[in-house]
């Protein structure tokens, strides 16, 4: 079995972390070192690349993960943008069946189906546990005494 590679923590050089745990460690160490975290920035190509803010542009120009991310962008040209705040849910639905432009005098003949990609953009994320806890806080609690 091959020994696992270790990375050095950018927040504390005394920390040597296995590569498989490095991202978790970065999040933990960032919280424990807020002063140093304010001076550091995360690479947009790899979240495990944390460098001083003044070196970020230089790092991103030569980042080894840069080409992989740029290739994904060219292979997948579909861009999804969130709906604007002006749009509301009552907008008119697009017909799933558009008539062929060649046939204009016959209703519903040779109908071509249109693929519509619907995306979910939550306005507020609420966990099931949060709602249970808030219900417990608002409901009066019954005090149990021995012998009841």
Swiss-Prot record:
Family designation: Belongs to the UPF0224 (FAM112) family.
Residue sites binding Zn(2+) 1 per the record: 9, 15, 25, 29
The entry's keywords: Metal-binding, Repeat, Zinc, Zinc-finger
Protein name per UniProt: Gametocyte-specific factor 1-like
Region (Disordered): 67-99
Residues annotated as binding Zn(2+) 2: 43, 49, 59, 63
Biased composition (Polar residues): 82-95
An example molecular function term from Gene Ontology annotations: zinc ion binding
UniProt KW Disulfide bond keyword: no
PANTHER family associated with the record: GAMETOCYTE SPECIFIC FACTOR 1-RELATED, GAMETOCYTE-SPECIFIC FACTOR 1-LIKE
Pfam family, one: zf-U11-48K
Zinc finger residue ranges, CHHC U11-48K-type: 6-33, 40-67
tRNA-binding among keywords: no
Species per Swiss-Prot/TrEMBL record: Homo sapiens
């Amino acid at each position: 079995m091959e020994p696992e590679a270790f990375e050095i923590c950018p927040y504390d050089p005394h920390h040597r972390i296995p590569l498989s745990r490095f991202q978790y460690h970065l999040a933990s160490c960032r919280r424990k070192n807020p002063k140093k975290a304010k001076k550091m920035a995360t690479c947009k190509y790899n979240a495990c690349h944390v460098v001083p803010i003044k070196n970020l542009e230089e790092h991103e120009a030569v980042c080894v993960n840069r080409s992989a991310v740029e290739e994904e962008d060219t292979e997948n040209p579909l861009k999804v943008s969130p709906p604007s705040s002006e749009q509301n849910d009552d907008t008119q639905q697009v017909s799933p069946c558009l008539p062929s432009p060649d046939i204009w005098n016959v209703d519903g003949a040779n109908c071509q189906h249109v693929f519509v990609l619907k995306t979910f953009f939550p306005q507020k994320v609420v966990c099931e546990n949060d709602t249970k806890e808030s219900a417990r806080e608002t409901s009066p609690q019954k005090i149990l005494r021995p012998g009841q």
